[in-house]
């Protein structure tokens, strides 16, 4: 942004970072505006959870709840994503290392967001973007990471190991957003 060069990132948080790190987002936004360039995020979310959902919502007379899920194979996205999703962890380790992070009060979460230390799941920013696009006012938002398992052992070339039956093969991040307008968005 300092050099006035347009940039686009596939970082999931960059899609709509206003609800996970507003301070740094404002700094980047102000710098980009000052230097006449655009800094943006893009990828899976803007098509399937952004434009598609907002287009369908725009053609609907009444909405009470938007609920949906998406899935992908962590094997296709490399070691960093596989580890961030808890692939290969026992359920006990998944709970300690992944799921426990979300067990906090709204005040604790907001403090982390304001300090720029919050680590959102891949759906957190989508819900914020969708509310912004639809003109909804967020009153609360939570996330819960749930381990996904399989009944048989699975060989993981990404992890270079065999994930045992019943251990985490990845996760589902369920993000629930309540709005002043009474519409609930639940994505995973």
Enumerate the predicted regions with their spans.
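General beta-strand structural signal in soluble alpha/beta enzymes
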Residues: 7-10, 39-42, 67-68, 140-141
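Rossmann-fold NAD(P)-binding glycine/threonine-rich loop
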Residues: 2-6, 10-37
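Short, ordered loop/turn segments at secondary-structure junctions
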Residues: 11-15, 44-45, 71
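Short amphipathic alpha-helical segments and helix-helix/interface helices
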Residues: 25-29, 54, 127
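Alpha-helical support elements that line or immediately flank enzyme active sites
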Residues: 47-59
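Short Asp/Glu-rich motifs
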Residues: 19-20, 51-52, 150
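Short secondary-structure capping/turn micro-motifs that flank functional sites
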Residues: 16-17, 48-49, 147
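Active-site-lining helix/loop region of Rossmann-like oxidoreductase modules
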Residues: 58-188
């Amino acid at each position: 942004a300092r050099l006035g060069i347009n940039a686009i990132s596939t970082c999931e948080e960059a899609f709509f970072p206003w609800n996970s790190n507003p301070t740094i987002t404002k700094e980047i936004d102000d710098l980009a505006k000052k230097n006449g360039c655009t800094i943006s995020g893009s990828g899976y979310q803007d098509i399937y959870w952004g434009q598609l959902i907002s287009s369908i919502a725009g053609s609907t007379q009444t909405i009470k709840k938007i609920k949906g899920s998406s899935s992908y194979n962590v094997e296709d996205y490399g070691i960093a994503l596989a580890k961030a999703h808890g692939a290969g962890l026992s359920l006990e380790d998944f709970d300690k290392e992944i799921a426990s992070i979300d067990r906090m009060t709204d005040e604790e979460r907001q403090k982390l967001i304001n300090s720029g230390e919050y680590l959102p799941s891949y759906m957190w920013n989508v819900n914020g973007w969708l509310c912004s696009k639809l003109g909804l006012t967020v009153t609360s938002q939570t996330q819960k990471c749930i381990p996904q398992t399989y009944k048989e052992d699975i060989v993981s070339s990404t992890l270079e190991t065999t994930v045992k039956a019943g251990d985490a093969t990845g996760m589902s991040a369920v993000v629930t957003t309540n709005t002043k307008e009474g519409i609930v968005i639940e994505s995973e």
